Amino acid sequence: MHDQQAVILRERYQPMEDNNNDYVVRRLTPLECERLQGFPDGWTDIPGTSDTAQYKQMGNSLALPQWQIIIDNMAKYLPDGATMGGLFSGVGGFELCWVRTHGKGTAIWSSEIDKAAERVMKYHFGCEEEGIKGDIEKYLDRPKF
């Protein structure tokens, strides 16, 4: 048997004692969750979005690094000028990876039922119908994963 035990959280943010050792367990911040998934800092931190919505968005999202590698490798098999549309886009993880490979304007549409996630998509990728330009240019540089 192991001489260590699993840490059990008694109450949120409350120290607990285990064999005379004090531990403090805390929740990750939305920024830390974005970084953990490989998103740019502040990706879900847009005006009108609560921390709760940000946690939900990151929890329902995907980790970007492996998808960036897959999309990069797919590119050599696709025709020049390839575009994508996204069903159930969430906060745009696939779309972000796509435009980093294929360029701005190549993720041409998305569909999302969650209103907070839809706001994130419009904020970054824009929405012609609503006159929102988006700021995706800030995120086209590839991070080093």
Q: How does the language model describe each region?
A:
Residues M1-T83, R100-T101, I113-A116:
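Class I SAM-dependent DNA methyltransferase catalytic core
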